C-alpha cells in the first residue's frame, strides 16, 4: 500500500484521467448488468457516478473507522463477526441501491446474506486449494499467483451476480405478495 501511495504522485494528468475513465466505465458496465438482471432501465450516467462515488468514499472511510475500533479488542471471534456484519451491510446497500427500481428490504437482506455466505465459504475453499495444490506453482512459478488472482476475481463476480439474480427473484416474489 505504501508503494502504491508513493507511486500515485508519478501518475501525472494522463494517469489520473485514465483511472477516472476506467472508474466510470466499470460502474457504467456494472450499472448496465445489474439493471439488465432486474429488467429495468438504467440510470443517467451522472446519477450512477454520484451514487457509486459515495459508495467509493463512504464505505472505505467507515471501514477505516471500524478497523481502528477493532484494534482495541483482543477477541478474534468478535472481530470476525463484526467484519462479516459490516461486509453484509455493504452487500445489502449495494443490492438495495444499485438497481434503478424499488427493492424489497427483505429480498436484499436475504440475498446479500446468501451471497456473502457463499462468497466466504468459496473464499476459504479457494485459499485451501491454492495453498495445498503445489502443481500450479511448480509448473507456472510466480505466474500462478496472477492466474489464481484472475480466477478468483472471475469466481467472486459470478457469485456476486448470482446474488443479484437471487435478489431479483426474491424481490419479484415479495412485491407480488404485496400487490
Which residues does each PLM region occupy?
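Membrane-embedded alpha-helices and immediately adjacent juxtamembrane helical segments
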Residues: 1-179
Amino acid at each position: 500500500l505504501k508503494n502504491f501511495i508513493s507511486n500515485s504522485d508519478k501518475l501525472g494528468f494522463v494517469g489520473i484521467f485514465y483511472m477516472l475513465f476506467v472508474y466510470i466505465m466499470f460502474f457504467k458496465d456494472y450499472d448496465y448488468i445489474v439493471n439488465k438482471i432486474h429488467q429495468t432501465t438504467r440510470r443517467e450516467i451522472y446519477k450512477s457516478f454520484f451514487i457509486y462515488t459515495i459508495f467509493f468514499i463512504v464505505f472505505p472511510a467507515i471501514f477505516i473507522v471500524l478497523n481502528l475500533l477493532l484494534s482495541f479488542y483482543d477477541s478474534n471471534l468478535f472481530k470476525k463477526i463484526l467484519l462479516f456484519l459490516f461486509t453484509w451491510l455493504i452487500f445489502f446497500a449495494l443490492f438495495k441501491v444499485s438497481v434503478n427500481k424499488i427493492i424489497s428490504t427483505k429480498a436484499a437482506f436475504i440475498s446479500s446474506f446468501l451471497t456473502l455466505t457463499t462468497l466466504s465459504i468459496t473464499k476459504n475453499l479457494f485459499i485451501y486449494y491454492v495453498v495445498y495444490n503445489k502443481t500450479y506453482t511448480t509448473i507456472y512459478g510466480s505466474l500462478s499467483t496472477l492466474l489464481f488472482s484472475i480466477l478468483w476475481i472471475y469466481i467472486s463476480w459470478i457469485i456476486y451476480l448470482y446474488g443479484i439474480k437471487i435478489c431479483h427473484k426474491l424481490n419479484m416474489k415479495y412485491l407480488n405478495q404485496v400487490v
